[in-house]
Amino acid sequence: VYMNKYKWYYVHNYNKVKGGIFVIEVKNVTKKYGNVVAVEDISFSIKDGEIVGLLGPNGAGKTTTMNILSGYIEQTSGEVTIEGYDNLKKSKKARKQIGYMPEGVPLYTDLTVKEFVTYMAELKQVDKKVRKERVENVIEKTGLTDVQNKLTRNLSRGYKQRVSMAGALVGDSKVLILDEPTVGLDPKQITEIRSLIKELGKTHTVILSSHILSEVSQICNKVIIINKGKIIAID
């Protein structure tokens, strides 16, 4: 569905969704840095349980879009709602719905896996009564049980990605946003992370960015193609 047909696509499909409600709605969003336009008038919607790929070359606007969704930055104009919460008017509640894994695996390397995930649970204000159980569940879900007592600095790149993903998940967010989750991994690690993302898609809405067509076609059931800050197609 190309951009000149997008308005029709959005209105037509909005009425098909139960209750007319999407988990994420982005309407005519633009982000400018001075005179530089990072994303321009983008619109899309994501339903509960979808695994959505944001596909485009480097500098296309993928990370900017994800940073807006996750609450790291604010859009210049347009509207974003997460689970019905406006990202500007009800930013705290909107951010609570999101688990974000930025590109680059930002970990505290002097902490063990379990210590890091526990620390992330504290930052995300997970109730103390359920924090220990939540941490254990997330560690198991991301396949980190056998390495939970190892320092994160001593892990392979693939396991570091898993730890970062566990940190994003531990807040019990409904939406998981993954920025270039397989970048820098070897073929075996890529296969493992892709399988993990598919498994997480059974219980979460997942949005991931990539510049690799084969990756999003294997993992995602919906693809948003973006280039030079504009959405080119939605499939």
Label every model-predicted segment:
Residues 1-30:
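ABC-family P-loop ATPase nucleotide-binding domain
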Residues 24-26, 31-227, 233:
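ABC transporter nucleotide-binding domains
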